[in-house]
């Protein structure tokens, strides 16, 4: 956040705040200017590790380029200030004239080629406080950071987990486990077992990607070459595996929430897919009949972005929404900065993504669980390792306010000073049906992540799974 704020501030300083796209499409620009001016490059350099000279060089290279695209990814939105980071990333694209431009950032077309503006909010009342979700999506993403709290308070008494493993993916594993055990019923629907499934009252086996027909909806409006494709099932489901739609259809009927006439097993859910496809004058039947069941969509010019994507009545981009003020994001940002200054000498743990582990999906793949990847090493650069008198392969204790764990040191100068890293997804030791994963589980780094109402980001309700202050200590004896 502070690096992006400094970069935006420097670019505005160099350009004299002259931004043609802002003049045409922007509003509340002065509030953006005020926010970034509080975090100039020289001020934040010791927190970001990026000098004012480097920020200036990056700014000048962006301004000199014919075009530039800006991208943030998963680790940023999990670091406690994802909303502001993504906002500043979009503002960077806007003020440099790279939004809606070839070579810059734009939105490809899709078979549903449009956006729905926010229409009010849905409020969910809980024992902890009220959660507000923008419509039309509504409460589709309840925050995992307070799952244990909601279970302990009695707000959640039954839980159905679909293709997930909250025991590992949510912070404070021990507390999450105790909470899940208090549920009246826990059901897991998945294609293979997991630690969470082991705790479940029922494990329901679902079909895999070869056993079901499909139209990929998720990539819509995210493809550089936009297309839509229908794929038939390749093989019949084995054993007692069932399609997810069938499982929920059956549950709804047995709970008397719908009648068999409303939700019969001859309805495979494709009428809902057809409703999406109809926006592009497409249908599942049409896709079945074309070669390869694939239709390429006509791509529009990137400059069509503003006409297609601005759905506010005034057709303007709010450069600094009032909601950021009212939700306390800016006050929180200042508090985070003060915390970073106070913890300047403390190490920060970030989550690592490698080809050997992705979201826990590769826990049971033998060839990916060899050597140091059989465990979940703590990566640290040699400067920090020397300060702590650590050597390659040494076992250390890593502690945060939320918990502690043991990890094996792996020295890597790919990391900057002040930062250590561990992979997300390890720790399936309790999944007894996964031979490799249970024998070589590695350690779950999310044990160090905080939970509870104060740990999640306002607006997004995102958990803080990265940028966690930690201390590392040598193990003198195993009694330590």
Whereabouts are the PLM-identified features?
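Conserved short loop/turn motifs at secondary-structure junctions
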Residues: 46-50, 73-80, 164-168
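Long, well-ordered, tryptophan-enriched scaffold segments
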Residues: 1-65
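Extended redox/cofactor-interaction regions of prokaryotic respiratory oxidoreductases
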Residues: 1-6, 90-198, 208-221, 226, ...
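Long, contiguous, secondary-structure-rich segments that constitute the structural scaffold
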Residues: 232-290, 365-379, 383-480
């Amino acid at each position: 956040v502070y690096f992006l704020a400094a970069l935006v501030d420097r670019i505005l300083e160099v350009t004299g705040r002259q931004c043609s796209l802002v003049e045409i499409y922007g509003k509340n620009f002065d509030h953006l200017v005020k926010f970034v001016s509080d975090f100039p490059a020289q001020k934040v350099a010791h927190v970001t590790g990026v000098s004012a000279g480097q920020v200036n060089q990056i700014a000048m290279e962006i301004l000199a380029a014919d075009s530039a695209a800006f991208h943030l990814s998963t680790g940023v939105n999990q670091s406690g200030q994802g909303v502001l980071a993504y906002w500043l990333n979009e503002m960077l694209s806007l003020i440099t004239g790279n939004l809606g431009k070839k070579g810059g950032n734009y939105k490809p077309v899709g078979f549903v080629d449009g956006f729905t503006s926010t229409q009010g909010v849905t409020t969910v009342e809980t024992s902890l406080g009220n959660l507000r979700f923008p419509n039309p999506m509504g409460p589709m993403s309840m925050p995992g950071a307070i799952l244990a709290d909601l279970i302990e308070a009695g707000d959640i008494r039954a839980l159905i987990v679909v293709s997930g493993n909250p025991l590992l993916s949510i912070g404070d594993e021990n507390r999450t486990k105790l909470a899940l055990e208090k549920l009246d019923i826990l059901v897991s629907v998945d294609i293979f077992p997991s630690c969470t499934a082991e705790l479940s009252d029922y494990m329901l086996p679902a079909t895999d990607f070869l056993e079901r027909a499909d139209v990929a909806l998720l990539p819509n409006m995210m493809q550089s070459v936009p297309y839509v494709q229908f794929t038939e099932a390749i093989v019949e489901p084995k054993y007692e595996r069932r399609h997810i739609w069938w499982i929920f259809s059956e549950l709804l009927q047995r709970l008397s929430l719908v009648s068999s006439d409303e939700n019969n097993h001859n309805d495979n859910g494709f009428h809902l897919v057809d409703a999406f496809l109809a926006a592009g004058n497409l249908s599942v039947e049409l896709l079945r009949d074309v070669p390869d069941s694939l239709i390429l969509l006509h791509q529009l010019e990137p400059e069509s972005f503003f006409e297609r994507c601005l759905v506010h009545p005034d057709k303007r981009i709010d450069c600094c929404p009032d909601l950021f003020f009212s939700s306390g994001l800016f006050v929180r940002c200042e508090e985070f900065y003060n915390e970073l200054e106070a913890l300047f000498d403390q190490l920060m743990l970030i989550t690592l993504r490698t080809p050997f582990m992705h979201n826990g999906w590769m826990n049971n793949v033998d060839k990916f669980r060899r050597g140091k990847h059989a465990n979940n090493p703590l990566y640290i650069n040699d400067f920090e390792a020397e300060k702590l008198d650590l050597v390659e392969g040494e076992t250390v204790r890593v502690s945060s306010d939320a918990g502690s764990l043991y990890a094996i040191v792996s020295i890597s100068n790919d990391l900057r000073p002040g930062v250590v890293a561990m992979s997300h997804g390890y720790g399936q030791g309790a999944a007894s049906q996964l031979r490799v994963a249970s024998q070589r589980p590695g350690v779950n780094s999310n044990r160090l992540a905080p939970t509870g109402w104060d740990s999640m980001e306002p607006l997004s309700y995102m958990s803080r799974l990265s940028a966690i202050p930690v201390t590392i200590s040598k193990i003198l004896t195993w009694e330590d």
